[in-house]
Amino acid sequence: MLKHIAVDFDISEKDVGNNFIKLFSNITNLIKFQISHKILILTIGLPKVDDEKIVEFLKFYVNKSFVDTNKVKISFVGKWYDLSSNLVSEIKRLLDISGNYNTGFLNFAINYDGHEEIVDACKLVVRKVINNKISIDAVNEAIIKENLYTSNFVPPDLIIKTGKNDGLNKTSVGKLNGFLLWDSKDSKIVFTNKSALEFDVERDINLF
């Protein structure tokens, strides 16, 4: 049974056009899939669109009623604190109202870069070595993992990457572009070769 699924909705605001309702409906269907199939952890790579669009999505689809009904803990991975004040406030609200739940875990990767995640983890480890909290010889993969944005979660069993693959027709070929870079080492990866607007949770997870 899959414990952790990660899906990266890789699409620009230009490519979304006027189809935000469709895009966010696809993301919502994925969240419903997590709940109905009792997937413990779901990580969603949010699209690079205007902050206010993300605020609208979170307020409408990931509201207090959803959180309380499903007892899901919401987390955000990435440098979300660098985003607009309105979005940061909404993120803090969700962190606050969901913090005591543990029936399921819903993570949103936003303003996230896999290389930066590893660099930031290394900086934290170096500081701990300098401050004599750990020895240099104690540094290993587990120590790096403990200092990642995703330190509290097991790596995904399955990663699904949306987006056209530069004209290639095979779903097995594509670019992960650093999504959950450290944690993707042993994950099964599916490239849908379809736009995020065409994402279908039942079909695309069945590719696995």
Predicted regions span which residues?
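Flexible, compositionally biased loop and terminal segments
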Residues: 1-208
